[in-house]
């Protein structure tokens, strides 16, 4: 089998495994470090249901997939991460058959919105009822259209700098938009609750220190903010 080593990236593992299953050859997905101990079992049965041969290491990497992925009806556990759902939404438009994905307990739903918006930009459609992430319908045999695309700045990375400024300084982060679908834009709301000063302008957000206080924040849909906010 060919090998794809994703390093320590959980996103790459969950995103590229269903994409790798589009081909007709076996592909072994490997990882390094702590990624080898992170849960991947949520991918195994859905991929098998979609016609992929899967050999897994007890719900952990490495995982070997042998496609092609065929489509059909599949149930996916969305309670751990939306990353695998994103991988399916990217891969399944290229399957030979139509697919219905039933998602149970979806988290990080803003990232699903980002995926759907990006697919649309590339000429691919995955249908669902707005605000409802429990079911998606994807026609097979779609084709991606090549376009020029500008990748947004990363709010997950910016959050650490903004939190540092709230604790002991001042910073202006440019070329980021609070209108983004990225879930981590909510770091601004969290810092405001903590008492930091936030100024939002077009294309830039400024954060400066003020006396901070305890606050409550639900990170269900923005888990990447948790390490920064606990500071």
Protein language model features and the residues they cover:
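Short, structured segments at the rim of ligand-binding sites
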Residues: 1-231
């Amino acid at each position: 089998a060919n090998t794809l080593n994703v390093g320590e990236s959980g996103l790459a593992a969950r995103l590229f495994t269903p994409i790798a299953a589009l081909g007709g050859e076996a592909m072994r997905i490997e990882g390094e470090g702590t990624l080898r101990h992170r849960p991947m079992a949520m991918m195994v049965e859905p991929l098998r249901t979609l016609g992929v041969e899967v050999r897994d290491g007890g719900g952990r990497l490495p995982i070997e997939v042998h496609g092609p992925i065929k489509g059909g009806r599949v149930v996916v556990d969305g309670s751990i991460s939306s990353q695998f759902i994103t991988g399916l939404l990217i891969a399944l438009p290229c399957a030979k058959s139509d697919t219905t994905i039933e998602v149970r307990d979806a988290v990080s739903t803003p990232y699903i919105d980002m995926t759907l918006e990006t697919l649309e930009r590339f000429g691919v459609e995955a249908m669902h009822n707005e605000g409802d992430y429990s079911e998606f319908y994807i026609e097979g045999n779609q084709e991606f259209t090549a376009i020029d695309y500008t990748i947004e700045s990363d709010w997950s990375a910016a959050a650490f700098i903004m939190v540092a400024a709230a604790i002991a300084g001042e910073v202006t982060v440019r070329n980021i938009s609070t209108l983004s679908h990225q879930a981590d834009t909510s770091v601004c709301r969290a810092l405001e609750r903590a008492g930091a000063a936030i100024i939002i302008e077009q294309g830039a957000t400024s954060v400066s220190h003020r006396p901070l206080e305890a606050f409550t924040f639900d990170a269900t849909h923005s888990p990447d903010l948790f390490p920064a906010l606990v500071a």
